[in-house]
């Protein structure tokens, strides 16, 4: 279900104004199965109901329209294999499809789909090695580039690709990339990321050099970069015994630190960062808490009111 909050508010409502709607089926305006994005005054999503389709809707959740059917992956027997990862970027849906691994020459299919016309282009066909499977994590998009892992070639490490979304070609491969490294963010052709066991790093593409900006010997870190801040959720080891949330400004000055406690069985996950809040979940999906970014010197988890308890009439 799609939920929304008014600007400056942390109270979420179901995006549906149908009278007496129970918000529990595909007939609800807010119903959406996978993927969600915004572009040029419309909302977009992907539905798996009967057809594998990209849909467009108005900002109030009404007038659902099919833009196009997403490319289907079929095995040697012609059976359909649907699903994958979905990223909305600058008027396009970037779709990393599940390859049919029963095919001996399978490789990861990557598509660029124009949101308003449905025009579809397959990317990186000439560059992605055979037997490249769908990456469950480590994928990011920024500044016109897709970053994603390639098949592992050595113990604990895997090549990491930088693909140009305009040309459809892979331009760079980081050969020595640990699975525990964070995803990459590209600002003005400088790459930002956390390297496991090393710290927060910058990579100058023009010079081909990496600089460690904040040395940090932690096992793993989720990172969220904004125009003004950097937020990290660090884990001390593979046992996940200690989890710390750190806030820095873009000059790498530490602004705040919070030792997280488990909520249920897990430490909270970083999910979304906006101008008004850093949102966290306890299951890697459902937002349950937020942090006020205006008080980073005293980081505090604030629990959201259950968004499923209300609807917008």
Functional labels for PLM-detected ranges:
Residues 2-23, 51-74, 105-129, 154-176, ...:
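Surface-exposed loop/turn elements that mediate protein-protein interactions on large endomembrane-trafficking
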Residues 41, 50, 91, 118, ...:
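Beta-strand-connecting loop/turn residues
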Residues 1, 44-46, 94-97, 147-149, ...:
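Residue position within the beta-strands of beta-propeller blades
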Residues 218-243:
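Loop/turn-rich, solvent-exposed surfaces of beta-rich toroidal or solenoidal domains
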Residues 95, 137-139, 148, 159, ...:
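C-terminal regulatory/effector modules of DNA-binding transcriptional regulators
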Residues 24-38, 73-90, 128-143, 175-188, ...:
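Repeated scaffold domains used in trafficking and secretory/extracellular systems
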Residues 14, 25-149:
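Long, acidic/polar, low-complexity amphipathic helices and coiled-coil-like
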Residues 95, 232, 248, 264-269:
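Catalytic-core helical/loop segments in enzymes performing group transfer/polymerization on anionic/lipid-linked
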């Amino acid at each position: 279900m799609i939920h929304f909050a008014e600007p400056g508010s942390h109270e979420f409502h179901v995006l549906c104004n149908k009278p007496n709607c129970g918000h529990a089926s595909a007939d609800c305006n807010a119903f959406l199965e996978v993927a969600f994005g915004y572009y040029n005054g419309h909302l977009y999503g992907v539905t798996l109901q009967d057809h594998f389709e990209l849909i467009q809707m108005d900002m109030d959740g009404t007038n659902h329209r099919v833009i196009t059917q997403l490319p289907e992956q079929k095995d040697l027997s012609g059976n359909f294999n649907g699903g994958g990862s979905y990223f909305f970027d600058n008027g396009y849906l970037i779709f990393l499809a599940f390859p049919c691994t029963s095919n001996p020459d399978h490789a990861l299919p990557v598509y660029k789909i124009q949101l308003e016309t449905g025009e579809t282009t397959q990317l990186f066909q000439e560059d992605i090695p055979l037997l490249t499977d769908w990456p469950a994590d480590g994928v990011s998009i920024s500044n016109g580039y897709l970053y994603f892992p390639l098949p592992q070639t050595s113990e604990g490490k895997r090549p990491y690709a930088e693909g140009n979304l305009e040309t459809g070609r892979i331009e760079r491969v980081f050969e020595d990339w640990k699975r525990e490294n964070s995803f990459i963010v590209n600002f003005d052709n400088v790459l930002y990321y956390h390297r496991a066991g090393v710290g927060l790093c910058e990579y100058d593409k023009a010079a081909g050099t990496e600089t460690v900006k904040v040395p940090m010997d932690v096992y793993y870190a989720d990172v969220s970069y904004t125009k003004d801040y950097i937020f990290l959720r660090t884990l001390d080891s593979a046992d996940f015994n200690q989890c710390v949330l750190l806030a820095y400004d873009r000059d790498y000055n530490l602004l705040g630190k919070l030792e997280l406690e488990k909520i249920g069985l897990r430490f909270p996950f970083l999910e979304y960062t906006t101008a008004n809040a850093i949102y966290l979940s306890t299951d890697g999906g459902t937002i349950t808490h937020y942090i006020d970014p205006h008080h980073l010197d005293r980081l505090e988890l604030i629990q959201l009111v259950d968004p499923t308890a209300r609807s917008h009439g």
